[in-house]
Amino acid sequence: MARQNEIEIQTRIGRQRITLDKIIHFPRGLAGFEGRHDFTLLQLREGAPFLVLQSLDDPGLGLLVADPYSFLTDYQIRVGDPEQRLLKLENIRQVAVLVTVSIPAGQPEKTALNLTGPILINHRARIGLQVPQTDASLPPQFYLHMDDANGSTTVRRKASPPAAGEDKGDVQE
């Protein structure tokens, strides 16, 4: 039973209790989900690099997200003044940057970060905003190689998945 300062929802990863101070409001929604405004972040596993950005408006909607800096040290985004005002940013340290992660069914080797649609969250004001990036030098996706056998992640320094038999040019991180 949920307490007065929390809500309880059934999600694709099970029943979750969400305290009201963990709700993040997205005034514009997200790309493709403009009508969904209230979300929370759910941890899948302790220490895992991935989270679920869970909609509270639609409990069936949860997006896999990750901190891009866990995989890329040189990822840069541009945030204009209107977006900074909407996020109520007073200091850059108030913002967390996340990117959506796609894992095609049955093809974990094609796990990719979406670098062109970062999600910014002002953790103090609990406001979120997706800020599309238009930098042509930025690859739209950044492919990861997930190795369940030893729990490691290998980063592919290329913008497309490997072809069959192709040397992956992997760098361990």
UniProtKB/Swiss-Prot annotation:
Keyword vocabulary terms for this entry: Bacterial flagellum biogenesis, Chaperone, Cytoplasm, Translation regulation
InterPro entries linked to this entry: Flagellar_assembly_factor_FliW (IPR003775), Flagellar_assmbl_FliW_dom_sf (IPR024046)
Region (Disordered): 152-173
Location within or outside the cell: Cytoplasm
GO terms under cellular component: cytoplasm
One Pfam short name: FliW
Record GO biological process: bacterial-type flagellum assembly; regulation of translation
Oligomer and partners: Interacts with translational regulator CsrA and flagellin(s).
NCBIfam families the record matches: PRK13285.1-1
PANTHER family for the chain: FLAGELLAR ASSEMBLY FACTOR FLIW
Family in the record: Belongs to the FliW family.
UniProt protein name: Flagellar assembly factor FliW
Biological source species: Nitratidesulfovibrio vulgaris (strain ATCC 29579 / DSM 644 / CCUG 34227 / NCIMB 8303 / VKM B-1760 / Hildenborough) (Desulfovibrio vulgaris)
